[in-house]
Amino acid sequence: MSAFTTKTAVYVLARAFPGTELLVWLGTVMALYGVVYAVLENDCRRLLAYHIVSQVGYMVAGVGIGTEMAVNGATSHAFAHILYKGLLFMGAGAVIHATGRRKLTELGGLYRTMPLTVALYMVGAFAISAFPFFSGFVTKSMVVAAAQQDHRALVVLALTMASSGTFLHTGLKLPYYMFFGTDRGLQAREPPRNMLVAMGLAAVLCIAIGVFPQPLYALLPYPVDFEPYTGMHVTESLGVLMFTALGFVMFLKALTPENTISIDTDWFYRKGARYFMWLAEKPVARYEQAVSNVSATVALPLLHETARAGLWVDLTGVDAAVNGVARAILRGGGALRRLQTGIVTHSALAMIAGVIAAIAIFAVVWQ
């Protein structure tokens, strides 16, 4: 998924920000950044993940250059990267599935028991390294050629160095120490058939795109004016790859992986978490304890006394008034009840008396 989902950002950049100068330099830094951290990595999955950063850097730089060739290169490289990076992760996953280990310092000697996995992995390694007749050669080189055509010598140099570093670590260091190198005596075997079939399909596509790039070129957003298989281009690419291989042989001991954990930007939140824990355990905890003490010694007794006073006011004041009114009404009702005898003559007499009283009142008022 990581090989696929990272391309959504490239798509957004290509649609919204082609030709943005800042992206050229961000992409160039990304291409080198991933390679530099891959040098330090011992975990095969993290090593491949760092090269995702590097390869996406090519795409971002291509979008930033913004010419038709550069955008075509970024788009085609995004498509090719999904295939060969998926193949590389499947190869590493097959090794982890077979051995339960993922550190290069714990692997080695697997070529005897996992030859198909080695062969399929190397197809992906050649593709990401831009070997001729593999998919990366016909896509990645388009971005570099666009930078050269746009007279960006520094960008061309940086992207070429990143390509060399990719071959050094993904195409040489990782397979050497994972499949060859010191035999660790691991009892491994080829992964299940469905895993091999998936790797095989990805490998076939990596080779097919490298040999027949025109169907992919036909899908690109602009007409393609780029020929990857020129004598000069093939010679330059093979020269970079050969010198990289020579450097690997010469500095093999220096490139031996060490059983360490590489710290990347996670250094910041590791340090931040340490200070956060100190803050939570010391000042914040002390503040919470002080608030609890004040609450227990001052606030809670005050609240209890206030509640008692409120209860007294309710019982002696509010309830007394309400109950007093109710008693008065009850007594008044009892007194009035005695006036009602139920005899018709008494009722008639009361009505006559009431009428006489009303007439007398009106007479007095209207005088």
Q: Model-predicted segments: where are they?
A:
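Hydrophobic alpha-helical membrane-embedded segments
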Residues: 85, 243-260
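Hard-cation-handling environments
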Residues: 191-245
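Hydrophobic core segments of alpha-helical transmembrane domains in multi-pass membrane transport
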Residues: 31-34, 125-129, 160-164, 202-209, ...
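Membrane-entry segments of alpha-helical transmembrane domains in multi-pass membrane proteins
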Residues: 18-22, 76-79, 154-160, 234-236, ...
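Aromatic-capped, Gly/Pro-kinked transmembrane alpha-helices
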Residues: 218-233, 255-367
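Alpha-helical transmembrane segments and their membrane-interface junctions
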Residues: 126-142, 203-224, 294-298
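Hydrophobic transmembrane alpha-helices and their helix-loop junctions in integral membrane proteins
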Residues: 1-194, 211
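Alpha-helical membrane-inserting segments
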Residues: 13, 17, 61, 209, ...
